[in-house]
């Protein structure tokens, strides 16, 4: 029927907009309502038939509205703007024509119902998100403007309904404006996104509890709009922004905490920069106040925590230690690595830093020292008793608080205060997995091998990593439910071996996460919206149908129940009519023949054709359930999980859901189950969207529940009516289930393969590097090393020239650096093995599920069997790779690493003994060092006496190995011959510069071997009292003035100037002369005072020529 044939006038002021998008939910509703507009029944019709047009119109209106409310597709802003005015025009016209409560309620509450169906997708960038929200706000203003209120008033309808234009405009616009204000305030606190925050960030930011910024946006005042995509998407975006502020503010409290030691505060600052202020594109963004605070903190750190550069070059470095050492040495939190060739101090990372008598770290935040903790966890060596006591006290207290708290903010603050930041938790997990992979379980029973300290670190790090991962998206919105389910489900599989070793397997970690970070259930919001909808229906029913129930009431409540069930996992609270209560009691309202006649009229897709009195008869309910639900069940089970078959199944399910609405009661929640099934199957109509295993399980459960309802209805009709019972939805008999499970299983396999591919590549790269390093080291240690007493030479073969020389410390540093490269490759191998083991564990569990599903299918060659074979083949490949790669980590030593480890162990023992002997004041340390030398020499002689299978390497390979290991070490050049030295004389005729060579002024200084440049020698030199420039000038001036009457040499001749030790007193220098020569004679010096002759005292001696002057090294 065209619009020109309608006799109902359109309201004034309605102008049709541009053509709306085709096939949208609002466009479909508009088309359905357009076909409903017809003139009222003529008064000449017989009595009793005048109600039929109104009934048919109400049924069609109800069907169209139900399709709109229960549709899985969303309404875009463009569709809403294009269809709004024509749709409102049609509703007002229908209401003037029929005066139905359905038309009144739908027209009055259409703005709110449309807002609940509006599509919203906010981009990740704030500017784009604000622009998108402005579009939504303009759309809300357009559908709730004056044209809408005038149209409703002209039709005699309310504008102040709960979901009407006035309330929706006020509530939605106020919510959007408040959301924008809160979001902008959170963005202003982020130095990464705000230039103002970068320059004006205060170190005194108050902590922001998790979820607090969005608390005012989820108050009961917004309950009517809470399920809408506008609110849900806005809360999701706000959660991403505000949760960063929460984590950042919790960490910020520690960087200037006066109760912490300076080193602890500096380490918290570095962790803050790494976790929250470093971006891939801009690097570290450090606000000026934070930089100034860090510089002030570093100046207060005890220098004893740093190892001098000359000693640091002999030690193996790690990436974490280099990060801390570089930042502390360069006094900048931006510094992460030292430039090549830089000589820099090194921070101590030994277990002794945790000792109670060492005041470097605060006892309440020992876990903040990342390089020291990583080394402690990787090596597994127990620290001292005092350090163990401090660590256990902190770890036990932290783990107890994490276990016994159900507040996310309390747990986050507890983890952060103890030093378990997001990056630290990840690093500690990697360190412990490396320790487990290194062969510890091979020597100990399964599940053991970790010390108590390691177990506590593992428990806290595992819980902390998952808590911080959830905290980034935590919020009161439906999307967080999926995030929580995903992270919770993968928490014990991702690090399965470590979870088992620390006792968090078997659901312990999942339960801990559920207690702390479980999503909040919006029970009150949904209950408030339900009460509001019921109230609106009751109002419309009293006004237009004398209190009779509206056909749309159940539809609206089903829509709300389906939303709660599919988005929040909430079971509907409305009690459904049990099937047993529908058994006929007393005389039936209609004869069985009437029921049979009406049942024969049930045809898909017709919703009318049966008289309302028959539909409302309880005796007719089993017929509808057996036929309608049974047909829907058969159509769905026989549809393959492909777009076209699922589209047809969805139409049958929608017909079964809407059949008899308003007259036929909902039995065992069958309409809610049908609606949930439609929502779950709707993504299958879009190409490229595959099912998940969880979705397949939910759909199978709903099909089984519908089968119970249909089977019960068939049993009620017997023996009067014999209907074939529906086939139970089994995997072996349902095309939908077998195809859906097969696609879901293959989707899981694809995800596992995508995870395994980079891990295998990383594993391959690490193994190649390890092989190269091992071969190089094996060839390196096949060489013979000779010494001339001060330097080392490498001899690759008897007939080859010696390579070198190098100083011993230079060679030790080169080997240590090469070992560092080896350890980097080893860490990459450990991380890859841990990730690959997680893939193997998940694949094994997935294969078990597929085996159970495939066992339900009798015929061979089915699609599930094919997928199962693919999974089995993938598991065999990944398991084989993991098993072969794990052999490199088995045993006490990695193959090819034995000689290098022996060399490093001996080098460390000799170096420690040598340093102790030099710093000792008694003979005990010297004797211990001599004994260590003796033991080392005996060990070398014993090894040389054994016949050991040597790695067959050529002289060229050994030469290449020496060049590779010693590539960055500078050869120690021999001393320059005397001909290359420039001779300095004592000639000082300032008027004859042409007779002298100015070459010495441009020559570099050569430090003679007699000068001690060791840390002890430099410390002794720097501790002396030095002559000031003015004192030196006074002495030299006195010498020049006394040169005219030089005294003869004798007992009173002036002696050398002396440099006194620290703590001595230097006498005020005076002009030397005959009257005070006794005061400066050598015999008057205090005993034990060491003197230093001054070689440059000018003395006039014309008889001495430059050629006769002895050479002096500048």
UniProtKB/Swiss-Prot annotation:
This is Inner tegument protein. Keywords: Host cytoplasm, Host Golgi apparatus, Host nucleus, Virion, Virion tegument. Residues 1-51, 1046-1114 are annotated as: Disordered. A motif (Nuclear export signal) lies at residues 263-272. Belongs to the herpesviridae inner tegument protein family. The gene is UL37. It comes from Human herpesvirus 2 (strain HG52) (HHV-2). Plays an essential role in cytoplasmic secondary envelopment during viral egress. Interacts with the capsid via the large tegument protein/LTP and participates in its transport to the host trans-Golgi network (TGN) where secondary envelopment occurs. Modulates tegumentation and capsid accumulation at the viral assembly complex. One of its GO terms (biological process) is virion assembly. The keyword tRNA processing does not apply. It is found in: Virion tegument; Host cytoplasm; Host nucleus; Host Golgi apparatus, Host trans-Golgi network. Interacts (via C-terminus) with the large tegument protein/LTP (via N-terminus). Residues 568-1114 are annotated as: Interaction with large tegument protein. Pfam families: Herpes_UL37_1. One of its GO terms (cellular component) is host cell nucleus.
